[in-house]
Amino acid sequence: MKLIVGLGNPELRHAATRHNIGFDVIDHLAGSSTFSSGKGNYRFTKITAPGGPLILVKPMTYMNLSGHAVVAAMNFWKIERENLLVICDDVNIPLGTIRIRAKGSAGGQNGLKHIIQSLGSEEFARLRVGVGGENMPASLSSFVLSKFTAEERKCIDKVIPVCADAVLDFASLGVEHAMTKYNGQVC
């Protein structure tokens, strides 16, 4: 069993923003599955995938407190770190680029930073989705909370299903395979 966590902010006003790309990938994977409240501040659904069951989680905390929900879900389902994949936005990666890593630093992503602090380890897989632009504003917080332009949305709509495929490959074939196959520019 794998725990797949998509990072985002819970309020409706944050839907379809750069910061909520993790939620978008989780929703794509979930399809018509319904989400339930977990024992902790998160919503989840289970799906069956070629590599076995996947628990899809959306923390209902704000991004910067995502670690609380991740730890609660891991404890509830007794998930080890090697069976965890976190999906998040990354402003330091060009729009439309996927970067999967088996471990590493937060790289300035505050949701990842809190998860690392909460777990006491950087040893978990992450799938970063590039949301950066050429003309980044001085205020990164307003940038990540902004919606994509129409042109950017066309690219993101191509990236989300590729990210979902990468998650399925991570679950069935492992992080190294997913890295080799999916790391790079999608659009």
Curated annotation (Swiss-Prot):
InterPro entries attached to this UniProt entry:
Pept_tRNA_hydro (IPR001328), Pept_tRNA_hydro_CS (IPR018171), Pept_tRNA_hydro_sf (IPR036416)
Where is it located? Cytoplasm
The reaction(s) annotated as catalysed by this protein in its Swiss-Prot or TrEMBL entry are: an N-acyl-L-alpha-aminoacyl-tRNA + H2O = an N-acyl-L-amino acid + a tRNA + H(+)
Instruction: List its EC numbers.
Output: 3.1.1.29
Keywords of this protein's UniProt record, alphabetized?
A: Cytoplasm, Hydrolase, RNA-binding, tRNA-binding
Swiss-Prot/TrEMBL GO biological process terms:
protein quality control for misfolded or incompletely synthesized proteins; rescue of stalled ribosome
Q: Tell me the superkingdom of the source.
A: Bacteria
Gene Ontology MF terms in the entry: peptidyl-tRNA hydrolase activity; tRNA binding
Q: Where is the active site?
A: H19
Q: Does the keyword Cytoplasm apply?
A: yes
Any idea which positions bind tRNA?
Answer: H14, Y62, N64, N110
One annotated Gene Ontology cellular component of this protein: cytoplasm
Kindly list the residues the record flags as site (Discriminates between blocked and unblocked aminoacyl-tRNA): N9
> In this chain's numbering, which residues are marked as the site (Stabilizes the basic form of H active site to accept a proton)?
D89
Subunit-level organization: Monomer.
Give the protein's function. Answer: Hydrolyzes ribosome-free peptidyl-tRNAs (with 1 or more amino acids incorporated), which drop off the ribosome during protein synthesis, or as a result of ribosome stalling. Catalyzes the release of premature peptidyl moieties from peptidyl-tRNA molecules trapped in stalled 50S ribosomal subunits, and thus maintains levels of free tRNAs and 50S ribosomes.
HAMAP family (alphabetical): Pept_tRNA_hydro_bact (MF_00083)
Question: Which family does the record assign?
Answer: Belongs to the PTH family.
| Protein name (Swiss-Prot/TrEMBL) | Peptidyl-tRNA hydrolase
- What organism is listed for this UniProt entry? Chlorobaculum tepidum (strain ATCC 49652 / DSM 12025 / NBRC 103806 / TLS) (Chlorobium tepidum)
